[in-house]
Amino acid sequence: MADEKTFRIGFIVLGLFLLALGTFLMSHDRPQVYGTFYAMGSVMVIGGIIWSMCQCYPKITFVPADSDFQGILSPKAMGLLENGLAAEMKSPSPQPPYVRLWEEAAYDQSLPDFSHIQMKVMSYSEDHRSLLAPEMGQPKLGTSDGGEGGPGDVQAWMEAAVVIHKGSDESEGERRLTQSWPGPLACPQGPAPLASFQDDLDMDSSEGSSPNASPHDREEACSPQQEPQGCRCPLDRFQDFALIDAPTLEDEPQEGQQWEIALPNNWQRYPRTKVEEKEASDTGGEEPEKEEEDLYYGLPDGAGDLLPDKELGFEPDTQG
């Protein structure tokens, strides 16, 4: 590399000398001579500069991905690689990749053992408080056999009752509640925090079918059907919900009094007299005609209903 650098510098200096010589010859009026020196000097200077610039960039060596690439490397590089690998293989690592320390082993031993947990399936009717009572031969928590606290206190025996309610057990419990508490006493007393309204569609359809029903008949028709003896409201699961239209204790029927059954489409009413039926038939025929007239706007179609000319406010055109 040093020899090449010296040669490049000498090549550039020689080109500059030829340019200076051509300039000197040009002053003596000899154009056929100084032109040759000028051309040779310019080529040598430009070539030397380009050559030097190309040497500034690092050389790239392409190594094929083959097992024979070791022959391309120099013996010095191969020796360095072998020495480094041998040193790594001979010197043991200061710490193995995974070492189980004694602190971790002690922590694993200090964890509680859950092998003493027992499972007992009980039905809904059985008393779960018996599980909470300690047995006679069971040692108390916090005391060992010697009467003093020791390492045995960490894994002392404990019992806890875990009650899981299943669907079958709930159905059995509901049946027992309905059998043991008949009548309206099973319903929770007091106002419910949540309430829901019944659908008003049934009310609209009922008004359309019987437009002449009296308010007394409507109140009786809206009252729900009297349920047989038993719980009228849902069980404890739905005690927070209640219907606003449900009858209260004051509205409950007395003994010997019958309520009408409220149906969604056909409303039942008490038997009316012949006079009431006749009035209902007369008014029932007139109301549809009035409703049809209300549907139209403007002047009616009949010739007799037209307004007279005096009320219209203008005179008819008499010009012929």
Swiss-Prot record:
Localization (cell): Basolateral cell membrane
Biological processes per GO annotation: chloride transport; sensory perception of sound
Cytoplasmic-facing ranges: 1-5, 54-320
Any one GO molecular-function label of the UniProt entry: chloride channel regulator activity
GO cellular component, one term: plasma membrane
Post-translational modification: Palmitoylation is necessary for activation of plasma membrane-inserted CLC-K/barttin channels.
Record keywords, A-Z: Bartter syndrome, Cell membrane, Deafness, Disease variant, Lipoprotein, Membrane, Palmitate, Phosphoprotein, Transmembrane, Transmembrane helix
Keyword Cell membrane: yes
Known tissue expression: Expressed primarily in kidney. Expressed in specific nephron segments and in the stria vascularis of the inner ear.
Transmembrane segments: 6-26, 33-53
Biased segments, Acidic residues type: 284-295
Superkingdom to which the source organism belongs: Eukaryota
Sequence positions bearing Phosphoserine: S110, S168
Biased composition (Basic and acidic residues): 167-177
Positions where lipid (S-palmitoyl cysteine) attaches: C54, C56
Region annotation (Regulates channel membrane trafficking and ion conductance) ranges: 1-72
Extracellular-facing ranges: 27-32
UniProt-listed InterPro entries: Barttin
Disulfide bonds: none
Membrane topology: Multi-pass membrane protein
Annotated segments matching region Disordered: 167-233, 250-320
Known function: Regulatory subunit of anion-selective CLCNKA:BSND and CLCNKB:BSND heteromeric channels involved in basolateral chloride conductance along the nephron to achieve urine concentration and maintain systemic acid-base homeostasis, and in the stria vascularis of the inner ear to establish the endocochlear potential necessary for normal hearing. Most likely acts as a chaperone that allosterically regulates proper sorting of CLCNKA:BSND and CLCNKB:BSND channels at the basolateral plasma membrane domain and functional switch to ion conducting state.
Assembly and interaction partners: Interacts with CLCNK channels. Forms heteromers with CLCNKA in the thin ascending limb of Henle and with CLCNKB in the thick ascending limb and more distal segments.
Clinical note on disease: Bartter syndrome 4A, neonatal, with sensorineural deafness: A form of Bartter syndrome, an autosomal recessive disorder characterized by impaired salt reabsorption in the thick ascending loop of Henle with pronounced salt wasting, hypokalemic metabolic alkalosis, and varying degrees of hypercalciuria. BARTS4A is associated with sensorineural deafness.
Name of the protein described by the UniProt record: Barttin
